[in-house]
């Protein structure tokens, strides 16, 4: 790939598609799990949506930890699904089995249509309350506001290819912001690269130049939802640009809005909502409510008061649900 990373392609969906064609009565296939259920990843959006809504789907057994199925023979970040389809079945819904550490939780799940189902059945009631809050307030989801990874067209090999166009950024040094910018990008291409701050001429940015003068709240593009590692959420100031190592959740003209959004995005409820969909950029934030107005005059939240308490109350969560959410976040890593 042009950015120095090796492209990866999913192929397992083709086995399911072929099995559908040749199986006379039923098929049972084992393949990576989390992303197809959430219609996330290359080639999986249409496949995942079609499969989860197929009336021939009889059961989905999901193991978040692939080692419970394969031992140390496979390290699959997506977990594993055992998917059973029956040719003659024409009834809505399917049996969903969530298997963790030797225990199973079985539930009947309706075909979700355009919605995504939570991977953990314990999350269904809470996510339904989040959806109700979004619907009742005519809000959108944050996914729609997230800016593309290629926002400033700075590839991860930019520093390697253009060593004369950058210099390391040292905190406190004088920078002429009329002609120069701070640039957050990888020092090397590929997995060995680490995101670091540099100083570069403003003219190295040729796309979306207007965003240099705004504040973005960004996360690591590799861990955007915070599932496996800290998402490194931070505010990038209005003199800066960044490469593909970061993705902007939102951009604001004022620091106040960026700071309010940052506080919102780091609450228990919103961090939990990020975990409800895969952190690949195709599905990031699909269940995160976006209140859109992050100024002090917004009608939903008072940013001068405790946001966690306000969100729990607005979403109408009971004490057990609040305790569950806090436990999910506090035991994440």
PLM feature segments, named:
Residues 22, 66-245, 252-319, 323:
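C-terminal substrate-recognition regions of SAM-dependent nucleic acid methyltransferases
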Residues 1-68, 79-82, 261:
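Conserved Class I SAM-dependent methyltransferase catalytic core
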Residues 30-31, 248-250:
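Conserved beta-strand segments of the P-loop GTPase G domain that flank and frequently precede/overlap
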Residues 32, 86, 327:
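Surface loops and adjacent helix of pleckstrin homology
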Residues 1, 11-15, 35, 71, ...:
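Broad hydrophobic/π-residue packing in well-ordered secondary structure
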Residues 320-333:
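Short, amphipathic C-terminal "tail helix"
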